[in-house]
Amino acid sequence: MIKNSFISVIPQEDKKRKRGGSVEFQVFNFTNKIRILTSHLELHRKDYSSQRGLRKILGKRQRLLAYLSKKNRVRYKELIGQLDIREPKTR
C-alpha cells in the first residue's frame, strides 16, 4: 500500500493548508489502517489483540462517518464513494 495515497483523495488546492484534523482525512487514515489490519488477520487468525484493535478502529470510523453524515450529507456521500465503503445499515 502506498503511504502517500491520500493525495488523490484530498483535492490539490487543499494541500497547502494542513488537513490532518479534517473528518475526511481521519476517516481515510482509519480506512487504511483497517485494510492493513484485515490483510494481517487473514494470515494470523488468532491474533486477538489485533482483532480488538480492528474493532476499536472500526467503531471510531463509524462514529466519524455518523457525525459527517449528520453535518454534511454531500461530503459524506462523496467520501464513501471515493473510499469504496459501504453505507452502514440504519437501525
UniProtKB/Swiss-Prot annotation:
It comes from the Eukaryota. One of its GO terms (molecular function) is structural constituent of ribosome. One of its GO terms (cellular component) is chloroplast. Keywords: Chloroplast, Plastid, Ribonucleoprotein, Ribosomal protein. PROSITE patterns: RIBOSOMAL_S15. InterPro entries: Ribosomal_uS15, Ribosomal_uS15_bac-type, uS15_NS1_RNA-bd_sf. GO terms for biological process: translation. It is found in: Plastid, Chloroplast. Its main location: plastid. PANTHER family: RIBOSOMAL PROTEIN S15, BACTERIAL AND ORGANELLAR, SMALL RIBOSOMAL SUBUNIT PROTEIN US15M. Part of the 30S ribosomal subunit. Belongs to the universal ribosomal protein uS15 family. This is Small ribosomal subunit protein uS15c. The lineage of its organism: Eukaryota, Viridiplantae, Streptophyta, Embryophyta, Tracheophyta.
